[in-house]
């Protein structure tokens, strides 16, 4: 019997896709200008490759990506420049963050029947600032437990530790909880590795090259579809 649901926040309950896109574009343009790049096509190839490498290593600190990029070109723009660029990046994200249209209604309905938990990743970088949005506070009030993984000695998702910690916080077992997230590697593979049933949200409003669902977990494109899943019946 399911007694609890646990969610990721960014791109699961809160949508800041346009902010991430605008923040990336702003960073790319300013790096190109500051580094005196003329071959922008090759630069963008390097930019994407470095970003992918860091994300796969669960390093979401944009400054680390930019430092590697500038080193590749033999440049050093200085900490002040990168700090300012990171501030601008995360401000785009904060300004864009809005709960998905159906999110609050779904959370309120679920709260009547289940315990609710949130697990959000941070790498002690600016990514925590994505949670400074009023929309995060608006959602947080409905949850019984909230874990910021990647801080205070708590490993970041997909490590099983934050998932196991949430089970303890909510007083449930692996068989009594469902985890909902959007990132296949971080959320779905992470929860699955912790022995937790999971649901993959591929929200209809988010344009992304989704990976293959190799685990065969249930998929939804709207949070309202949670109530229709056999897992909750």
Regions picked out by a protein language model, each given a short descriptive name:
Residues 1-5, 15-18, 104-108, 114-233:
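Asp-based, Mg2+/Mn2+-dependent phosphohydrolase catalytic module
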Residues 2-101, 125:
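N-terminal helical cap/lid subdomain that shapes the substrate entry/recognition surface
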Residues 28, 76-81, 110, 138-139, ...:
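A broad, low-specificity signal for short, low-complexity segments enriched in glycine/proline
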């Amino acid at each position: 019997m399911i007694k609890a649901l646990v969610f990721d926040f960014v791109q699961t309950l809160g949508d800041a896709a346009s902010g991430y896109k605008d923040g990336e574009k702003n960073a790319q343009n300013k790096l190109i200008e500051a580094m005196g790049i003329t071959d922008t096509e090759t630069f963008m190839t390097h930019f994407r490759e470095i970003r992918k490498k860091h994300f796969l290593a669960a390093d979401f600190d944009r400054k680390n990506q930019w430092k590697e990029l500038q080193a590749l070109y033999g440049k050093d723009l200085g900490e002040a420049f990168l700090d300012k660029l990171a501030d601008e990046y995360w401000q785009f994200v904060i300004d864009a963050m809005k709960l998905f249209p159906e999110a609050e209604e779904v959370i309120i309905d679920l709260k009547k029947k289940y315990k609710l938990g949130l697990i959000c990743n941070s790498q002690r970088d600016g990514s925590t600032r994505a949670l400074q949005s009023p929309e995060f506070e608006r959602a947080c009030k409905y949850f019984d437990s909230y874990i910021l993984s990647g801080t205070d000695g708590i490993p970041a998702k997909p490590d099983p530790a934050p998932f196991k910690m949430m089970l303890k916080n909510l007083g449930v077992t692996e068989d009594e909880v469902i985890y909902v997230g959007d990132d296949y590697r971080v959320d779905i593979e992470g929860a699955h590795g912790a022995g937790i049933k999971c649901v993959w949200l591929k929200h209809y409003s988010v344009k992304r090259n989704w990976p293959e669902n190799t685990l065969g977990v249930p998929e939804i494109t709207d949070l309202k579809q949670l109530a229709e899943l056999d897992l909750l019946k």
